[in-house]
Amino acid sequence: MPVKVIEGLPAIDELRADNIFVMDNERAKNQNIRPLNLLVVNLMPRKLITDRQILRLLSNTPLQINVDFLFMASHEFKNTKQSHLDSFYKSFSEIKDDYYDGLIITGAPVEQLEFEEVDYWSEFLEIVKWSKSHVYSSLHICWGAQAALYARYEVTKENLPQKLCGIYKSSVEQPKNPLFRGFDDFFNYPQSRYTQSNPSEIKKVPDLEVLSTSKETGFSILAKKNLREVYLFGHLEYDRETLAWEYERDREEGLKPALPKNYFPKDNDKEKPQMSWASAASLFFSNWLNYAVYQGTPYLGERLGHHCGEENYDFNQKE
């Protein structure tokens, strides 16, 4: 949250250089705070658990947040009752005329399919295209990040030699970026994926900045310079037990998964998993809400539409 000081205080310039939100008396007098409106497109199979994980991270700031959950109407869900979706989720047709301060698109267990083979791909493209004119800042997670990069910039994905699964140390490459305010030089980051976005193609997109990397996982977090688009290739939202559950699921399906790296004490899957990324996850989501969403959107909600529009992309060629 902002710090109010007397204009001219010698420390102001240095604080602002460190991405500390400092305001003078005049701005403080006119400071108004309204609830932020967020849309979460939950593509994960265990929706109730993912809902809880996302909401926990969104609740760590003093900001009031109104959250809508969206489901893909073109997909038949196997793990979530329709009654739950009818009660707590909305379809795209119900919200397409609304404007949102922020959008979160989760991962999905479909990365081994080609994008066009996913049964809700056309609907996904429609949502991404709509977000350019109806959402101020969008945050994409894992498959959601890979798919959005493909939709917007034609960045393809490539298969990894084996599933990347575990907790990996990522290096902060741009410590002055507001999304990493308060971070140490390194942070732990859960990964669970079979594919990655093509690094050489990412480098060709001039508006994208690589914010964090890992020797083992490659690029881990990207963002547009104006923070209107943020791409997380891992799962900061995961709780302590998520990777353990996925590991057991894969074993039961006969996939013979490797043990998640840097996760179980002494690599013993009978032990309680180690939680080493909670503080980084909380800080990152708080920074996104504060710097990418709250500080950029207007106080008057009805003016949000004027702030959302950006350049258009040709999405039709992907359908």
Curated annotation (Swiss-Prot):
<feature type="binding site">
    <location>
        <position position="249"/>
    </location>
    <ligand>
        <name>substrate</name>
    </ligand>
</feature>
<keyword id="KW-0028">Amino-acid biosynthesis</keyword>
<feature type="site" description="Important for acyl-CoA specificity">
    <location>
        <position position="111"/>
    </location>
</feature>
<dbReference type="GO" id="GO:0005737">
    <property type="term" value="C:cytoplasm"/>
</dbReference>
<feature type="active site" description="Proton acceptor">
    <location>
        <position position="235"/>
    </location>
</feature>
<protein>
    <recommendedName>
        <fullName>Homoserine O-acetyltransferase</fullName>
        <ecNumber>2.3.1.31</ecNumber>
    </recommendedName>
</protein>
<dbReference type="InterPro" id="IPR029062">
    <property type="entry name" value="Class_I_gatase-like"/>
</dbReference>
<keyword id="KW-0963">Cytoplasm</keyword>
<keyword id="KW-0486">Methionine biosynthesis</keyword>
<dbReference type="InterPro" id="IPR033752">
    <property type="entry name" value="MetA_family"/>
</dbReference>
<feature type="site" description="Important for substrate specificity">
    <location>
        <position position="192"/>
    </location>
</feature>
<comment type="function">
    <text>Transfers an acetyl group from acetyl-CoA to L-homoserine, forming acetyl-L-homoserine.</text>
</comment>
<feature type="binding site">
    <location>
        <position position="192"/>
    </location>
    <ligand>
        <name>substrate</name>
    </ligand>
</feature>
<dbReference type="InterPro" id="IPR005697">
    <property type="entry name" value="HST_MetA"/>
</dbReference>
<keyword id="KW-0808">Transferase</keyword>
<keyword id="KW-0012">Acyltransferase</keyword>
<dbReference type="GO" id="GO:0019281">
    <property type="term" value="P:L-methionine biosynthetic process from homoserine via O-succinyl-L-homoserine and cystathionine"/>
</dbReference>
<dbReference type="Pfam" id="PF04204">
    <property type="entry name" value="HTS"/>
</dbReference>
<comment type="similarity">
    <text>Belongs to the MetA family.</text>
</comment>
<feature type="binding site">
    <location>
        <position position="163"/>
    </location>
    <ligand>
        <name>substrate</name>
    </ligand>
</feature>
<dbReference type="GO" id="GO:0008899">
    <property type="term" value="F:homoserine O-succinyltransferase activity"/>
</dbReference>
<feature type="active site" description="Acyl-thioester intermediate">
    <location>
        <position position="142"/>
    </location>
</feature>
<comment type="pathway">
    <text>Amino-acid biosynthesis; L-methionine biosynthesis via de novo pathway; O-acetyl-L-homoserine from L-homoserine: step 1/1.</text>
</comment>
<feature type="active site">
    <location>
        <position position="237"/>
    </location>
</feature>
<dbReference type="GO" id="GO:0004414">
    <property type="term" value="F:homoserine O-acetyltransferase activity"/>
</dbReference>
